[in-house]
Amino acid sequence: MARMRHFLKRCPAVLLSAALLAAAAGTAAAADTPAPTLGIYTTGDMGGRLYREDPVTGEAVEYSYQNVASAMEAERASVDAALLLDSGDAVDNGLVQDGGAAEALALRAIGYDALVPAVGEFRLGPEARDDFFAALGEASEDGAPVRVLSGNYLDEDTQSPEEDAYEVFTVELGRRAVRIGVLGLGAMEAPEELPESFVSGVRFAHRDNTSGSYSWEWTGYWQERLG
Protein backbone atom coordinates (compact mmCIF):
# COMPACT_ATOMS: atom_id res chain seq x y z
CA MET A 1 0.00 0.00 0.00
CA ALA A 2 1.65 3.17 -1.17
CA ARG A 3 0.76 5.36 1.78
CA MET A 4 2.38 3.08 4.36
CA ARG A 5 5.72 4.00 5.90
CA HIS A 6 8.71 1.84 6.79
CA PHE A 7 7.98 2.11 10.50
CA LEU A 8 4.52 0.58 10.08
CA LYS A 9 4.35 -2.97 8.79
CA ARG A 10 1.17 -4.68 7.73
CA CYS A 11 1.35 -8.42 8.21
CA PRO A 12 -0.84 -11.28 6.96
CA ALA A 13 0.09 -13.02 10.20
CA VAL A 14 1.81 -11.85 13.37
CA LEU A 15 5.41 -12.74 14.08
CA LEU A 16 6.40 -10.23 16.74
CA SER A 17 9.50 -11.89 18.14
CA ALA A 18 6.69 -14.23 18.97
CA ALA A 19 4.35 -16.91 17.71
CA LEU A 20 0.93 -16.62 16.19
CA LEU A 21 -1.40 -19.14 17.74
CA ALA A 22 -3.69 -21.02 15.40
CA ALA A 23 -6.80 -19.03 14.58
CA ALA A 24 -9.47 -19.36 11.95
CA ALA A 25 -9.00 -16.15 10.02
CA GLY A 26 -11.17 -17.05 7.07
CA THR A 27 -14.63 -15.58 6.89
CA ALA A 28 -17.38 -16.91 4.68
CA ALA A 29 -18.86 -14.34 2.36
CA ALA A 30 -21.31 -14.34 -0.47
CA ALA A 31 -19.77 -14.58 -3.91
CA ASP A 32 -20.66 -10.99 -4.74
CA THR A 33 -19.57 -9.59 -1.34
CA PRO A 34 -15.94 -8.62 -0.71
CA ALA A 35 -14.37 -10.59 2.11
CA PRO A 36 -13.82 -8.52 5.27
CA THR A 37 -10.23 -7.49 5.90
CA LEU A 38 -8.18 -7.80 9.07
CA GLY A 39 -5.03 -5.66 9.23
CA ILE A 40 -2.28 -6.62 11.69
CA TYR A 41 0.39 -3.95 12.08
CA THR A 42 3.68 -3.85 13.97
CA THR A 43 6.19 -1.20 14.94
CA GLY A 44 9.45 -1.50 16.85
CA ASP A 45 12.67 0.21 17.89
CA MET A 46 11.00 3.62 18.07
CA GLY A 47 13.35 4.73 20.87
CA GLY A 48 11.04 7.34 22.37
CA ARG A 49 10.60 9.27 19.12
CA LEU A 50 7.24 10.87 19.76
CA TYR A 51 7.01 13.82 17.36
CA ARG A 52 7.51 14.55 13.67
CA GLU A 53 10.16 17.11 14.62
CA ASP A 54 13.00 16.70 17.09
CA PRO A 55 12.09 19.09 19.94
CA VAL A 56 15.77 20.03 20.43
CA THR A 57 17.11 20.32 16.87
CA GLY A 58 13.90 21.00 14.95
CA GLU A 59 14.89 18.37 12.39
CA ALA A 60 12.25 16.14 10.81
CA VAL A 61 11.89 12.70 12.39
CA GLU A 62 10.89 10.02 9.90
CA TYR A 63 10.01 7.30 12.41
CA SER A 64 7.87 8.69 15.23
CA TYR A 65 4.74 7.75 17.12
CA GLN A 66 3.05 10.86 15.78
CA ASN A 67 3.59 9.49 12.27
CA VAL A 68 2.24 6.12 13.40
CA ALA A 69 -0.90 7.81 14.70
CA SER A 70 -1.55 9.46 11.33
CA ALA A 71 -0.80 6.30 9.36
CA MET A 72 -3.03 4.16 11.56
CA GLU A 73 -5.93 6.55 11.21
CA ALA A 74 -5.82 5.93 7.46
CA GLU A 75 -5.22 2.19 7.81
CA ARG A 76 -8.09 1.66 10.24
CA ALA A 77 -10.39 3.40 7.78
CA SER A 78 -9.34 0.95 5.05
CA VAL A 79 -9.88 -2.36 6.92
CA ASP A 80 -12.73 -3.93 8.84
CA ALA A 81 -10.64 -4.65 11.94
CA ALA A 82 -7.08 -3.99 13.02
CA LEU A 83 -4.50 -5.03 15.60
CA LEU A 84 -1.54 -2.76 16.36
CA LEU A 85 1.48 -4.26 18.14
CA ASP A 86 4.89 -2.97 19.20
CA SER A 87 7.93 -5.26 19.42
CA GLY A 88 9.70 -3.17 22.05
CA ASP A 89 12.56 -0.70 22.42
CA ALA A 90 9.74 1.83 22.52
CA VAL A 91 11.23 4.08 25.20
CA ASP A 92 13.91 6.76 25.25
CA ASN A 93 16.98 5.72 27.25
CA GLY A 94 18.71 9.10 26.90
CA LEU A 95 19.77 11.46 29.67
CA VAL A 96 16.47 13.35 29.62
CA GLN A 97 14.13 10.37 29.50
CA ASP A 98 11.14 10.39 31.84
CA GLY A 99 10.91 6.70 32.65
CA GLY A 100 8.63 5.96 29.72
CA ALA A 101 5.68 8.06 30.91
CA ALA A 102 5.33 9.94 27.62
CA GLU A 103 5.71 6.77 25.57
CA ALA A 104 3.05 4.97 27.62
CA LEU A 105 0.66 7.85 27.03
CA ALA A 106 1.40 7.80 23.29
CA LEU A 107 0.89 4.05 22.95
CA ARG A 108 -2.44 4.21 24.74
CA ALA A 109 -3.62 7.27 22.82
CA ILE A 110 -2.72 5.74 19.44
CA GLY A 111 -4.59 2.56 20.31
CA TYR A 112 -1.87 -0.08 20.50
CA ASP A 113 -3.18 -3.48 21.50
CA ALA A 114 0.04 -4.92 22.94
CA LEU A 115 3.74 -4.34 23.50
CA VAL A 116 6.40 -7.05 23.76
CA PRO A 117 9.21 -5.56 25.89
CA ALA A 118 12.74 -5.58 24.47
CA VAL A 119 16.04 -4.67 26.12
CA GLY A 120 15.26 -0.95 25.87
CA GLU A 121 12.41 -1.29 28.36
CA PHE A 122 14.69 -3.03 30.85
CA ARG A 123 17.35 -0.32 30.50
CA LEU A 124 14.96 1.93 32.41
CA GLY A 125 15.88 0.10 35.61
CA PRO A 126 13.57 -2.06 37.74
CA GLU A 127 11.43 0.68 39.30
CA ALA A 128 10.93 2.75 36.15
CA ARG A 129 10.38 -0.40 34.09
CA ASP A 130 7.60 -1.59 36.39
CA ASP A 131 6.06 1.89 36.39
CA PHE A 132 6.13 1.93 32.57
CA PHE A 133 4.42 -1.45 32.33
CA ALA A 134 1.81 -0.34 34.89
CA ALA A 135 1.20 2.92 33.00
CA LEU A 136 0.56 0.98 29.80
CA GLY A 137 -2.13 -1.04 31.52
CA GLU A 138 -3.98 1.92 33.01
CA ALA A 139 -7.56 2.51 31.99
CA SER A 140 -8.17 6.24 31.75
CA GLU A 141 -9.45 8.97 29.48
CA ASP A 142 -5.93 9.14 28.01
CA GLY A 143 -6.50 5.98 26.00
CA ALA A 144 -7.21 2.27 26.16
CA PRO A 145 -4.90 -0.08 28.10
CA VAL A 146 -2.02 -1.71 26.22
CA ARG A 147 -1.21 -5.33 27.07
CA VAL A 148 2.40 -6.13 28.01
CA LEU A 149 3.17 -9.64 26.73
CA SER A 150 6.26 -11.71 27.46
CA GLY A 151 6.51 -15.47 27.73
CA ASN A 152 10.22 -15.43 28.56
CA TYR A 153 10.44 -12.62 31.15
CA LEU A 154 10.33 -14.96 34.13
CA ASP A 155 10.69 -15.09 37.89
CA GLU A 156 14.13 -16.55 38.61
CA ASP A 157 12.87 -19.12 41.12
CA THR A 158 9.43 -20.14 39.88
CA GLN A 159 9.97 -19.53 36.14
CA SER A 160 6.48 -18.03 36.06
CA PRO A 161 6.00 -15.09 33.66
CA GLU A 162 6.31 -11.69 35.31
CA GLU A 163 3.76 -10.30 32.83
CA ASP A 164 1.07 -12.05 30.81
CA ALA A 165 2.76 -14.41 28.37
CA TYR A 166 0.11 -14.20 25.67
CA GLU A 167 -3.26 -12.74 24.80
CA VAL A 168 -6.04 -14.01 22.57
CA PHE A 169 -7.61 -11.03 20.83
CA THR A 170 -11.12 -11.27 19.41
CA VAL A 171 -12.09 -9.12 16.44
CA GLU A 172 -15.33 -8.94 14.51
CA LEU A 173 -15.06 -9.70 10.80
CA GLY A 174 -18.37 -9.57 9.05
CA ARG A 175 -20.67 -11.74 11.12
CA ARG A 176 -17.87 -13.83 12.61
CA ALA A 177 -15.68 -13.37 15.65
CA VAL A 178 -12.06 -14.19 14.82
CA ARG A 179 -9.65 -15.06 17.63
CA ILE A 180 -5.95 -14.27 17.18
CA GLY A 181 -3.39 -15.41 19.74
CA VAL A 182 -0.17 -13.47 20.28
CA LEU A 183 2.68 -14.82 22.41
CA GLY A 184 5.37 -12.31 23.34
CA LEU A 185 9.08 -13.23 23.30
CA GLY A 186 11.85 -10.67 23.59
CA ALA A 187 14.83 -9.21 25.47
CA MET A 188 16.61 -12.55 25.75
CA GLU A 189 19.96 -10.74 25.52
CA ALA A 190 19.17 -8.49 28.52
CA PRO A 191 21.42 -10.31 31.05
CA GLU A 192 24.46 -9.81 28.80
CA GLU A 193 23.74 -6.14 28.08
CA LEU A 194 22.49 -4.76 31.40
CA PRO A 195 23.88 -4.34 34.92
CA GLU A 196 23.11 -7.28 37.18
CA SER A 197 20.97 -5.07 39.42
CA PHE A 198 18.64 -4.41 36.47
CA VAL A 199 17.87 -8.11 36.00
CA SER A 200 18.17 -9.40 39.56
CA GLY A 201 15.55 -11.98 40.44
CA VAL A 202 14.40 -12.54 36.88
CA ARG A 203 15.50 -14.54 33.86
CA PHE A 204 14.80 -14.32 30.14
CA ALA A 205 14.69 -17.98 29.13
CA HIS A 206 13.48 -21.18 30.72
CA ARG A 207 16.22 -23.24 32.37
CA ASP A 208 15.91 -26.05 29.83
CA ASN A 209 16.52 -23.58 27.00
CA THR A 210 20.26 -24.27 26.99
CA SER A 211 20.64 -22.92 23.46
CA GLY A 212 19.25 -19.55 24.52
CA SER A 213 17.02 -19.36 21.43
CA TYR A 214 13.62 -17.84 20.82
CA SER A 215 12.59 -20.83 18.72
CA TRP A 216 13.14 -23.16 21.70
CA GLU A 217 10.86 -21.03 23.85
CA TRP A 218 8.08 -21.80 21.37
CA THR A 219 8.83 -25.38 20.35
CA GLY A 220 10.26 -26.51 23.70
CA TYR A 221 7.78 -24.88 26.05
CA TRP A 222 4.84 -22.82 24.82
CA GLN A 223 3.73 -24.85 21.80
CA GLU A 224 2.69 -27.82 23.93
CA ARG A 225 0.90 -25.62 26.45
CA LEU A 226 -0.94 -23.51 23.93
CA GLY A 227 -1.40 -25.98 21.11
Where in the sequence are the language-model features?
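Sec/Tat signal peptide C-region and signal peptidase I cleavage site
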Residues: G26-A30
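Bacterial N-terminal signal peptides that target proteins for export
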Residues: R3-L15
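Low-complexity, intrinsically disordered tandem-repeat tracts enriched in small/polar residues
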Residues: A24-A25, E224
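Bacterial N-terminal signal peptides
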Residues: V14-A23
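Acidic, metal/ion-coordinating pockets
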Residues: A31-G227
